[in-house]
Amino acid sequence: LKLLAHISVSQAKKAGSDVVKQDKDPKLGNLVYPLMQAIDEILLDADIELGGLDQRKIFALSRDHIEQLGHEKCAYVMNELLPSMSKPGAKMSSSDLYGKIEFLDSKELIQEKLKKAYCVEKEVKDNPCMDLARLIVYPLGHTILECKEYSDLEKAWVEGSIYAGQLKEALAN
């Protein structure tokens, strides 16, 4: 509760604006969410916190107030968010079974999810299969369909020499 004495309603709203739904009369939980994340940092005695780019304002709130409570700042590492596998332009959601791939999903479930994934041929923008290749597969040192670099895959995709079914199957394997 000590943290509550240091943070205003407008600061809490701003910190959560990219993560929780904001409206004129927000639910208390929407305002408390960023504070809970900051408190987790304290209770876990975290040296580093990993999150998506949408967590940036929450991390800034923690950074700005954590020392006032006698705790050391931690390092924040942010990465791009993977989009929903089932809807263009949306982020992954825990409520959409086929919209996300989880670490503990079986190979069979991953294959099933990728078969159903939104994937417009020759399109790179808002294409979750291409984002998965760019953000996960290639940075981990893997290749897809003999394309050594992501740029090679993108070029082949845009030219139409790779089809959606081929890409999805390669991602699943």
Where are these regions (language model features)?
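Divalent-metal (Mg2+/Mn2+/Ca2+)-assisted nucleotide/phosphate chemistry catalytic cores
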Residues: L1-A75
